[in-house]
Amino acid sequence: MRKYILLLALSFLMSAAGFTASAQNAVKVKGVVTSQDDGLPLIGVAVMAGPGNGVLTSLDGDYEIEVPAGTELIFSCIGFEEKRVMITEDGPAILDVVLKTESLKIEDAVVIAYGVRKKGTVAGSVATVKADKLKDTPTPAFDQALQGQVAGLTVLSSTGEPSASATMVIRGVNSINSGTAPLYIVDGVAISASDFNTINPSDIESMSVLKDASSTSIYGARAANGVIVITTRRGREDKPSVSYKGQMGVSSIAYGNWDLMNTAQRIQYEKEIGLSDGQNYDYLSKTDVNWLDAVFNDRAMLQSHEISVAGASDKTNYFISGGYYNQDGIAPGSSFERFSLRYNFEQKLTKKLSVGINTNFNFQNIQQADEGSYTLVTPISAARFMLPYWNPFKSDGSLASINDGSWKGQGQNPLEWLENNPLKYKKYKALSVGFVEWKPISNLTLRSQASMDFSHTTGFSQSYPSYAPNLGEGSAARSSSDTHNLQISNTINYRFNIGDSHEFNFLLGQEGETYHTEGFSVTGRGQTNDLLTDISFATRVTAWSSFADADYSRMSFFGRAEYSYSDRYYAELSLRSDGSSRFGKNNRWGTFGAVGFMWNIRNEEWAAGLRDVLSTAQLAFSSGTSGNSSIPNYEHLPLIGSTGNYLGDSAVAPIQPGNENLSWENAWTTNLALHLGLFSRINVDFELYNKRTSDMLMSVPLSYAASNGFGYKWDNVGAMVNRGVELNVNAYLIELKDFSWNLNFNAGYNRNKITELYNGVTEYERANTNTKLVVGHPLGEFYLNRFAGVNPANGDALWYDKDGELTNEFRAEDKVMTGKSFYAPWQGGFGTALRYRRLSLSAQFSWVADRWMINNDRYFDESNGRFATYNQSSRLLERWKEPGDVTDIPRHGIYTEFDSRLLEDASFLRLKNLMLAYDFSHFRLYIQGQNLLTFTKFSGLDPEGASNIYSAQYPMARQYTLGL
């Protein structure tokens, strides 16, 4: 590399010599250029005295140039601040220059893969979310704060349970069976979505969403679904600063659409359908319980306290924070408590050698409410079934109990059941990243980084013997799991410039990862005392299992080359080769690469007259590949496993056929982007993309004869396309000393289409999902019978058959593709921020459109007789009752089926955050609301489900928070 630089430098010097200015008052200047950081000589510094007169510094940082008196010498080098010195007739003859490292302001820095770049110099598609979008959000994790912030990033919560993470998708779903989540990188280390709540949002400095191949390809086989890069805070002040942040809040259900019968309606319904025999309605009518209010807490408390210390000097940089977060769930039996400690430290040992460590410790107490399944005892589900004249409380406010007969309903009181069957988890988490960085010569950086990610999770459930249904015999279960992930990376980065126009940056790297997990669970029964309901007091063990040890390893080599010319033309090339233990020996390695180009139109000479108008004008193009390896660890191997026991002896049998030819899933992405800035006030980003997934990793159904009894086998089959457009607008409409006003808007449209399945198959119905995979159709499209209404003459339900003719028979063969998918093609957000002196007001909305879900709750609530002994929707009072009635609910006894009647528009617009704040001299006081308003046609408790079927879901919470 040095020889290459020397040759270029010599050629530059030779050409420059021919154009060196000559005059009677010429001054010869020479000297050495060094770095302020380490005192080392700088190679390749451009020393310019005007057009055609310039030299480059040598390997020792030396330069010599002859210039006319009165000339301004300009010293410039990539990564350093430019320096200018005026040369007079009196000299100086010897001019040694020290260049200061160019420091990026936080707002001008863009975090990319394995580095940081200045805003406006990146060819790839990268969206940045800064800390001010996260720091005051009253959530245990950062994921909720991203909703509606980035075009092309869909964030949906599958549950409102406090410890749960959201589901994120970047530019559409790219695979049918393998993983669809982005790769999450925190301080250079990959984490899983389950660890979101281990990161205090206030510890985050910035997040970058990498969307195209140019920005993600260097992550190779893990980046097909995009990458989210998270950087935690560092000390940036010269002297130590101490800060405190506290929040107190209250939560309630955010949407809560509830149409189940009250007592008067229930009594009317029972009389109409013949369930009134033996009922004392005079007595029952005195009780009217809204089970939504009985089960869900409208005053669930939240509190958060954080203290941090940060500072920096020439040699030391540190950030230390400690936090406590406690949130009660709005559903009973759910809560989240976290203790966190972060320590980020960097130390410059010598001028050339630096070390650092980023460590995060975390302890959590978690209670999770059962959801997603229909039972008569778990409160979220049971609330829909309980009759309104069954009171879960006694007159004194205590729980009505099956033990003393105060519970008058059928079965068990769900709230009492929960109190007698607690389930708790504890999680211990440690993530530590250490690095050594060496700069043997100027502009050359060698870095080695190692990380250890360890978690230990325990679960403990009890069922007390004093609870009457247990008949005096308790039970207890404990589970334990351990996971550790070791990662190491080594990189070499060299950057230099030739003259003042050509800038180069080269990166070479190697990474390795090893992952291991193991665990067990055991259940014991026979305890006779509530206080002793534990495994050690069981009289017998009734269930046990040892989770099979799971291991995974990965090895990678990668590189990136960047070039820019005169701040006008930028080019990037990246390449990565990955080897994974998840694939067979025939296809263990995969190679991925990408190119990117960016044209900075504003810096063209012919655009000089437009610069007052165009603060930014850039055109970018990228194309390349990335991969997906998100499948179980051993699918390429034929496996045997336990099949239970026979006469007290254990037994094993083949459980998986294996596939040694299993290989990587590939995604080829092409991206075209236009970035415009107008009057330094309005910024517009417009992007088009096309992503094609091939060799999809799918669990392929096998015929019995071909599979030797195995039903499925993983294979590389099928293809899928995602095409879309994104728009992001940020406008600083007013920027005055005492008043400012900002508007932001983003929207993304993604069209998904399956282009190939497996073995010539063009369609395949997915069991228990009401969806079907069909070539030419989008993933997630519903496959249902079409409900046609009710025959007003006799009250029969009507459907359309496959040919569009009316029928009163519900037949599976009449299902059709509906043209409606669970995956929303449209998503986005918009917001505004106003400031008057020290008072500020901000609002942020998020939305998705053309998204559909099956409302499974209605299958039970509107059963029309199938589940009539339990509470039903008040809509059943509007069912068909006599000839001539026009309604969409059939006569009693015509049961509800899974048809298009249950398919609902789950599009929504949500006021995600509203904040009013006042900045005092040394602190900031604010009040804010989360999920304050929801606009939707969906009839369930919440439209934000992350599944194609909505069933007994834990709804999102509305929060009011006071913060300091």
Model-derived features: positions:
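Transmembrane beta-strand segments that form the barrel wall of outer-membrane beta-barrel proteins
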Residues: 246, 322-328, 571-580, 621-623, ...
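Hydrophobic beta-strand positions in extracellular immunoglobulin-like domains
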Residues: 33, 99, 436, 494, ...
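Surface-exposed loop/interface segments of Gram-negative outer-membrane beta-barrel transport/assembly proteins
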Residues: 105, 120, 236-289, 330-334, ...
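Short, small/polar-rich motifs associated with maturation and membrane association
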Residues: 1-12, 16-343, 347-362, 404, ...
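Residues on the lipid-exposed face of transmembrane beta-strands in outer-membrane beta-barrel proteins
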Residues: 232, 307-311, 341-347, 432-438, ...
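Extended, hydrophobic alpha-helical segments in both membrane/secreted and soluble proteins
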Residues: 204, 341-343, 448, 488, ...
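Repeated loop/turn-to-beta-strand initiation elements of outer-membrane beta-barrel proteins
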Residues: 315-318, 352-355, 443-446, 568-571, ...
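Glycine-rich, aromatic-lined ligand/substrate-binding cores of catalytic
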Residues: 822-854
